[in-house]
């Protein structure tokens, strides 16, 4: 009986068609595995026979209850069983645990008791995933002219549709931006190193990466870096200090050598005298 009722109602909807097909559907944004509400406003002076919620086929057929009684859901598409509910006051459709397959065009057809006409409202549902934190990959090379060319690639896992990439740079106290997942830039070591942040967004989320400074990616030991005045001053002071230490050490070494030489000679002479005395032996009595 239930299957027969479902088939008859479906044929009836196809035969009637929809009024208001020329109206633009209401855009509705949903989040994957979360819930969405398709609101429905019905004039208070209209008596309702039944309401049909459709997506590809019928999702649910709702018959208002008598005074003080809840509405009766006469049929539910098996794909939505356990995931849909109807508002008692407005007959709006609530869908939980959204999937990618739920995206598309929905129609609410309100069939009136007073006439054969009906009120129709359309919705275009788009389902998106909340974005994860983006990751930046850096590739760099040094040209013959001494310029570091850098390519930054911003990526996220399971991005989905309608994702926007924006690069933000704070340099010289000004904020600049660049659109696209790949940013190409150049930098000469010795200049102030720029830093970048990738911001990704879709209709349901907005998240930024950690800030990346490109200075560390061009730190090549063989690169002809432009030394700063402070660096030159520190190096000069270090060399002067080293030279002073070497000079003092050499002077001390020479002074010690000149002081110890006569003493060593005297010791040698004393040793020779002792040896001669030992060879001559004791004096006879």
UniProtKB/Swiss-Prot annotation:
Lineage of the native species?
Answer: Eukaryota, Metazoa, Chordata, Craniata, Vertebrata
- The organism sits in which domain of life? Eukaryota
Listed disulfide bonds for this chain?
A: 154-198
Task: Fetch the InterPro entries from UniProt.
Answer: CD2/SLAM_rcpt (IPR015631), Ig-like_dom (IPR007110), Ig-like_dom_sf (IPR036179), Ig-like_fold (IPR013783), Ig_sub (IPR003599), Ig_V-set (IPR013106)
Q: Which residues lie on this side of the membrane: Cytoplasmic?
A: 254-285
Query: What is the official name of this protein in its record?
Result: SLAM family member 9
Span-the-membrane segments of this chain are: 233-253
Q: Give the way it sits in the membrane.
A: Single-pass type I membrane protein
| Gene Ontology CC: one annotated term | cell surface
Pfam families xref list: V-set
Q: Which loops or segments lie on the Extracellular side of the membrane, by the record? A: 18-232
Q: Name the UniProt key words of this record, in alphabetical order.
A: Disulfide bond, Glycoprotein, Immunoglobulin domain, Membrane, Signal, Transmembrane, Transmembrane helix
Identify the residues that the record assigns to the Ig-like C2-type domain, covering every copy.
Answer: 134-213
Q: Which GO terms describe its biological process?
A: defense response to bacterium; plasmacytoid dendritic cell chemotaxis; plasmacytoid dendritic cell differentiation
NAD among keywords: no
Predominant subcellular localization, coarse grouping: membrane
Enumerate the subcellular locations listed in this protein's record, separating them with semicolons.
Answer: Membrane
Glycosylation: which residues? 37, 97, 141, 149, 175, 206
Secretion signal, residue range per the UniProt entry: 1-17
Domain named Ig-like V-type: which ranges? Answer: 25-126
